[in-house]
């Protein structure tokens, strides 16, 4: 857990070494922070406390580019800490974390997100209101997996020749 001041500097790092089955579902994790306004992140699979301390500013963390010759499932994952899970997800998707004012003990939420292999489809078509379209994707084959990725999402490709109208495919590099 990285707790930056309101300017995105002076991090307080709380490192938890999580092993075994607990890796995929961590709840009730405590972290150190001073009262005041902060931007808080969860960084999974960072490796060590020393590695986490290398992110001396929020900008250094968010601009991190990581290379991996093939995805192993152990790459770093980033989560934005917020008052609830929905806000955490929305902040991550926007790529902009908000300042949290810590006045005492409190509960927060963060969803950590894998940095690649997220595929999003958006299919639009004008239909009468009483019609429905069902899309069942049973298999997705990805021919070129990324070797370099960032911790934040961005829209990579837009394809205009979709099955029914516009299709947008969003991948993490």
What are the residue ranges of the model-derived segments?
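Tryptophan-paired
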Residues: 1-58, 122, 127-173
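Structured interaction patches on ligand/partner-binding surfaces of diverse proteins
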Residues: 17-23, 49-107
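Beta-strand-rich interaction surfaces with strong enrichment in secreted/lumenal proteins
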Residues: 28-31, 78, 97-98, 109, ...
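Exposed beta-sheet edge/beta-hairpin loop segments within beta-rich domains
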Residues: 29-34, 103-113
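A short, Gly/Thr-enriched small/hydrophobic beta-strand-prone motif that recurs across taxa
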Residues: 111-126
């Amino acid at each position: 857990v990285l707790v930056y001041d309101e300017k995105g500097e002076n991090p307080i790092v709380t490192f938890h070494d999580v092993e075994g089955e607990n890796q995929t579902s961590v709840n009730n994790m405590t972290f150190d922070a001073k009262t005041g306004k902060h931007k808080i992140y969860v960084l999974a699979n960072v490796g060590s406390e020393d590695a986490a301390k290398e992110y001396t500013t929020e900008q250094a963390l968010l601009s991190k580019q990581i290379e991996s010759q093939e995805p192993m499932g152990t790459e770093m994952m980033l989560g934005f800490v917020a008052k609830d899970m929905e806000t955490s997800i929305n902040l991550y998707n926007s790529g902009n974390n908000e300042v949290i004012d810590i006045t005492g003990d409190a509960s927060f939420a963060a969803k950590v997100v894998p940095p690649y292999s997220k595929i999003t489809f958006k299919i639009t078509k004008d239909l009468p209101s009483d019609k429905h379209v069902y899309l069942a994707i049973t298999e997705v084959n990805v021919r070129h997996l990324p070797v370099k990725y960032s911790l934040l999402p961005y829209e990579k490709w837009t394809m205009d020749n979709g099955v029914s109208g516009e299709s947008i495919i969003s991948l993490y590099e």
